[in-house]
């Protein structure tokens, strides 16, 4: 029997996406799922628990998410990190318009981009955020 040996594959790193918009999730998953396992939560209130459970290498926050917006969620993650209750996270925010960059900066996001999500820009932004 002439079987080709299979090489072991490295486990994929996890990216957490927080959005209540299906189209935003689909765009992010399509752009990143080749290199990462994409896990979704629908509200900002779910992010902290998901970070603890899934230990993502990157968190992608939609500025406009459910009960706790992306800015508040980003600030909450930064406070938890400073209190050493969670490991440091790289955070990319998805904004609605260029003017929202001020909010992303104030929320201490590592990077941001304006929706609609361009797959190439998101992959580049993700790579840069992870290597910073």
Language-model-detected regions and their locations in the chain:
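His-Asp phosphorelay/catalytic-motif detector in bacterial-type signaling
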Residues: 57, 82-90
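Two-component signal transduction core modules
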Residues: 59, 112-113
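Alpha4 helix (beta4-alpha4-beta5 surface) of REC/receiver domains from two-component response regulators
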Residues: 72, 93-111
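Acidic, metal-coordinating helix/loop segments flanking the phosphotransfer/catalytic sites
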Residues: 42-58
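C-terminal output helix
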Residues: 117-126
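The C-terminal output helix
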Residues: 127-132
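Conserved phosphotransfer microenvironments
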Residues: 61-79
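Conserved acidic segment of CheY-like receiver
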Residues: 11-23, 27-29, 59
């Amino acid at each position: 029997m002439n079987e080709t040996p299979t090489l072991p594959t490295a486990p994929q790193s996890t990216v957490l996406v927080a959005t209540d918009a299906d189209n935003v999730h689909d765009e992010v998953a399509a752009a990143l799922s080749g290199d990462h396992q994409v896990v979704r939560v629908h509200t900002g209130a779910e992010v902290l628990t998901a970070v603890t459970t899934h230990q993502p290498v990157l968190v992608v926050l939609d500025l406009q998410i459910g009960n706790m917006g992306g800015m508040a969620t980003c600030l909450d993650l930064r406070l938890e990190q400073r209190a050493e209750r969670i490991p440091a996270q790289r955070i990319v925010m998805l904004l609605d318009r260029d003017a929202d960059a001020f909010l992303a900066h104030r929320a201490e996001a590592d990077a941001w981009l304006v929706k609609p999500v361009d797959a190439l820009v998101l992959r580049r932004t993700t790579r840069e955020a992870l290597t910073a």
